[in-house]
Amino acid sequence: MTNFREILKEKRAWYKTIGKVYCPILKEYIIFNSRGFYHLRYDTHEKERLVKEQIYKFNLLPLVIPVIKNATKIFDYKKQEYSKPLGKYYEIWELREIMGEKSPTEVSVILRKIGTGNITFLSVYDRKIKTKKPPKSR
């Protein structure tokens, strides 16, 4: 298995190439800055995430762009709230899309706008979709 430092270096290099992606549902460009990548590695309280969790989030990164480009609705929106640590108001959007055919996964992309700045990528996670199995015949 490739060691974590190599994975981190590879994913960071790929992330830096993104720059910005247009989001039709928000009618704005989403900026991929260093804060978004930092949040994949550290939680809200600045504590480093477990390596397993970081790799999990890194592996979801390629799905972020299709979710942003193809989202047909905003799943959740948190209106402007004041953040003492940021010293500014912020807004949060959650976009969700189902990705994959064989084993569909619902991918959530979290976007944030601080003050009057740009909307930026903040995080990503997924949820396996449970498919109903036919009842067993007796």
Would you name each region that the model predicts?
Residues 1-138:
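Ribonuclease/tRNase effector modules and their secretory precursors
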